[in-house]
């Protein structure tokens, strides 16, 4: 814990809120980095970026007392504006966050748009390798324009509520060098323009892809989308903030009817992807589904946030993303099994069994103790909220899993 203690002594904190966020977030990230073998330089570099680029934009520190009034993020069931995750197959820690401004939810900033550019500038000033070319092109198409924002505010055409944010960032903590992604949630843009969310994003991707380098996989997704099982709704997208020639574009969807048949439909694009690799991955996905024992059923997509300090009050839909890269004729699926609301002890047992079957002996041995060290205040024999979702993909003959975690 030395980097945390050292930085806590020498860094100035402008207010008690940022210090509270630091005391909650930094130890968890540091313990996870140390468990994954990050060297000391990387630990300091990544915590320094959190301090400089993230803490100023996390808004109120969540408490039971302010839970009813604070701005709640779209990221997590509890409305927490930052969500850590761990790519356990590669040992890479990540976090996604929604920048929140000081005037959010007021007449000065009803749509939480005022700090987008400030936060982005902080990121690019911190790391000049961040390339905003594609991000800017999608932002101009998927965020509210100034005219739309003013019109909505003046006419009351749409009531903005917490959890209906439009943008966010994710940071892959790769050693001492982060890789940043930009996220666009288009539900508000859809409500304002009357254009369905899927069409908004598909049209934007086609417009930005001026050379048609991902037309073929995009056509396959668009053909599938109108015929998908389980009431699939495309709802947000992301783009890597790197050289556009190498950047991945991802489209995300929620599937209301949770079942393995629904996951199979997402994974194979309704039978449109039928490669040996895809089928091999499907077998392992089935194994993970059987181990987690997520109850099948129809889930609500639009739900109220859970209350801090209270256990989960619902189960959630399945989530999926498809990656689009030049040179790939098929969208590359990644599905998210969402056991949020099930006992964390059961989820951990299921994952450890999956690791053991893969021969990941060290991971199987250390997973539970590492997880407990990240959240020392949680009783994992009782909790049902920490391990929110498990993402699964399959590439080059290997499964890749990430665990998404709730800080509160």
Curated annotation (Swiss-Prot):
Described function: Prenyltransferase; part of the gene cluster that mediates the biosynthesis of echinulin family alkaloid. The pathway begins with the biosynthesis of the cyclic dipeptide cyclo-L-Trp-L-Ala (cyclo-TA) by the NRPS criC via condensation of L-alanine and L-tryptophan. The prenyltransferase criA then catalyzes the first prenylation step, a reverse prenylation reaction at C2, to yield preechinulin. Preechinulin is the substrate of the cytochrome P450 monooxygenase criE that catalyzes the formation of the double bond between C10 and C11 to produce neoechulin A.
Swiss-Prot/TrEMBL GO biological process terms: alkaloid metabolic process
Keyword hit for Transferase: yes
Domain of life: Eukaryota
Name of the molecule in the record: Prenyltransferase criF
Residues annotated to bind dimethylallyl diphosphate: 94, 181, 183, 248, 250, 252, 334, 336, 400, 404
Any single Pfam family the record assigns to this protein: Trp_DMAT
Keywords, ordered alphabetically: Prenyltransferase, Transferase
Subunit structure: Homodimer.
Membership in a protein family: Belongs to the tryptophan dimethylallyltransferase family.
Catalytic activity: preechinulin + dimethylallyl diphosphate = tardioxopiperazine B + diphosphate; preechinulin + dimethylallyl diphosphate = tardioxopiperazine A + diphosphate; tardioxopiperazine A + dimethylallyl diphosphate = echinulin + diphosphate; tardioxopiperazine A + dimethylallyl diphosphate = variecolorin L + diphosphate
Originating species: Aspergillus cristatus (Chinese Fuzhuan brick tea-fermentation fungus)
Pathway annotation: Secondary metabolite biosynthesis; Alkaloid biosynthesis
Enzyme Commission number(s) of this protein: 2.5.1.-
A single GO molecular function term of this UniProt record: prenyltransferase activity
